[in-house]
Regions:
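Conserved glycine-rich FAD pyrophosphate-binding loop
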Residues: 1-139
Length: 139
């Protein structure tokens, strides 16, 4: 467990030390399908060429990988993130794997429906999973 935190801290520190030479840093939690045998991605060259550095670390026996990417200077962070998420979706992976969707990711329909059942008035955590922020889930 400690190694995971050391790895995460080291890439973040590297990025902060060399931020003038580097692009943005992306951090992803990805749950691979249980039958996945290729744990380390093989990205298409046109996507792979956008990274200065990649670091992977994970959990034993559960197929959850934490993947940190440092982009090359000038690369569009939002576009690359979307390309990565599309790549993961095509592999059948789930994201985020460990820390729920928060306000950053779209909740898939079953999860969105679950939130609506738990909170019919949308009073407790409106906007979670990029759902409606309006009372009673109005759009």
């Amino acid at each position: 467990m400690t190694h995971r935190f050391v790895a995460a801290g080291s890439i973040a520190r590297y990025h902060s030390l060399y931020r003038k030479k580097l692009g943005a840093m992306l951090s992803m939690d990805i749950a691979l399908p249980r039958n996945e045998q290729e744990w380390f991605e093989k990205l298409p060259p046109e996507l792979n060429d956008k990274f200065e550095m990649k670091l992977y670390y994970g959990h034993l026996f559960c197929h959850v990988l934490h993947q940190n990417y440092i982009l090359k200077k000038g690369v569009d962070e939002k576009r690359v993130k979307r390309e990565l998420l599309n790549f993961y979706e095509d592999k059948g992976a789930e994201y985020p794997a460990e820390h729920n969707v928060g306000h950053e990711y779209h909740a898939k329909k079953p999860l969105s429906d679950f939130y609506k059942d738990l909170d019919p008035t949308n009073s407790f955590n409106h906007g979670i999973g990029r759902t409606s922020k309006l009372k009673h889930w109005r759009e």
